[in-house]
Each structure stands twice: as structure tokens, then as C-alpha cells.
Amino acid sequence: MKIFGRVVSGFGEGKYFVGLIPYKNKFKELTGFTPYEGTLNIKLKTYFDIDKYDPLEFDGFEIDGKEYFGGKVLLVTLFNKSGKFVDCAIVSPKKTDHSKKTLEIIAPVNLRKFLSLKNLDIVKIIQALK
């Protein structure tokens, strides 16, 4: 798998959700890293079907009567235009306000800062080796 997309602003909700302890612990278990509290959003030209790539699944949970949904994670490597990269993961929640053309990426670092990314920058994503 090799796809290209553009960095876009999200809704600002990634920080909240990734910061929830059950999600943070599950992401660490599935990816091997503690995620930075936030996501990088990548807009694609076409629909992305995560199920084609054998993703890892995670269950939802409940906190104080509020339900939080599960989803899927796919280990990938994200490259900036200079070739600098970070091993990270696509997160595909069962419930999202994003279109199927927008990927949410989690990583152990702030990807915008570490890779010097700004809105509309083009990035390359490849599936990580298992």
C-alpha cells in the first residue's frame, strides 16, 4: 500500500479522544507506542477502505454511562516531502464525523511539529511491515 494525501485541519476532537485512558492504553497495546494526544488528518482523493489491509480491531468502552465506540487501527509509516518519516497508525473509529476520504493518524509525536507539516502539504503513507 502506498497512498498520498494532503494535511488538513480536523475538528479538534482527536486530542480529547486519544487522551482518554482506555483509548490511550489500547492504542499503546496495538501499536507499541504511547500516542501523542491528538491526530493528524489527511485528505485523500478517493475513499480509503481500511479493511483491505488487515487492520487490528479494538472494542469500545463506557465511562460514567457514556459509550465510546471501538474501531480499527492500521500500522503505517508517514513521510513528509523531504523523506523524513515516522512510524504511526491510521485510526478508523466506528463512529466519526470525518468522510471516508479523511484519515486520522496517531503517532508517538506531534506529527505537524516533528515533520514540519502545514495544511495542504502532501504526505506519503505506506503500510508498515508486521
Curated annotation (Swiss-Prot):
The domain of life for this entry's organism is Archaea
Query: Any idea which UniProt keywords this protein has?
Result: Flavoprotein, FMN, Kinase, Magnesium, Metal-binding, Nucleotide-binding, Transferase
Which Pfam families does the record match to this protein?
CTP-dep_RFKase
| Cofactor: binding details | Binds 1 Mg(2+) ion per subunit.
Q: Which cofactor does it need?
A: Mg(2+)
Binding of CDP, residues: 10-15, 109-112
* Residues that bind FMN: 96, 104
Which GO molecular function terms does the record list?
A: magnesium ion binding; nucleotide binding; riboflavin kinase activity
Q: Which family does it belong to?
A: Belongs to the archaeal riboflavin kinase family.
PANTHER family (UniProt xref): RIBOFLAVIN KINASE (PTHR40706:SF1)
- Which named protein is this? Riboflavin kinase
Give the originating organism.
Methanococcus vannielii (strain ATCC 35089 / DSM 1224 / JCM 13029 / OCM 148 / SB)
Gene name? ribK
